[in-house]
Regions:
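Conserved metal-phosphate-binding beta-hairpin within the catalytic cores
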Residues: 75-108
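Glycine-centered helix-boundary capping/hinge motifs
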Residues: 76-77, 113, 125-126
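Phosphate-binding site of ATP-dependent enzymes
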Residues: 2-76, 87-88, 92-94
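Peripheral (often C-terminal) accessory segments that flank ATP-dependent C-N-forming ligase machineries
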Residues: 89, 119-142
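Residues within well-ordered alpha helices
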Residues: 71-72, 108, 120
Length: 142
């Protein structure tokens, strides 16, 4: 009902739209780094987002890691870094998008102990400590 009002108000054509259902759950942005030998999967729980992630925490999450390994990496055979955005509702994973790039949470990944560009390329990643990020935005007026 609301979508039809939106379409009419903005004079849009339904065939030009991609509409997703709202899924209530926990949002994650997942860093994935892969080559022929290793897969590094680092879930980042997103608490606050406004275009970019503002508040997030690196978490170990076997449900997400297993889903990426058994579903996504079976069909997506890239050999580099990419980002998966998803919603986790209980044990069910809903993929929102897959991006062939680093996410805005990449600095958090490096700070948590994994740098894909270091000399220890694709060493086994061990999460040493849970680390949180809160992005502070400042405005200057002149």
């Amino acid at each position: 009902k609301d979508i039809n009002k939106f379409i009419a108000f903005y004079k849009l054509d339904k065939k030009d739209l991609l509409i997703q259902n709202f899924i209530k759950g926990n949002e994650y942005t997942v860093f994935v780094h892969t080559n022929k030998k290793n897969n590094i999967i680092i879930p980042v729980r997103v608490y606050q987002k406004k275009g970019v992630t503002i508040d997030a925490k690196v978490e170990k999450n076997k449900t997400i890691e297993n889903y990426i390994k058994t579903k996504i990496l079976k069909v997506l055979t890239t050999k580099n870094c990419f980002n998966v955005q998803l919603i986790l509702k209980g044990k069910k994973v809903y993929i929102i998008e897959i991006n062939p790039r680093l996410s805005t949470t990449f600095a958090l990944i490096v700070k948590s102990g994994y740098d894909p560009f270091s000399n220890s390329f694709l060493n086994k990643f061990i999460l040493k400590k849970k680390i949180k990020m809160h992005r502070y935005l400042t405005a200057k007026y002149y």
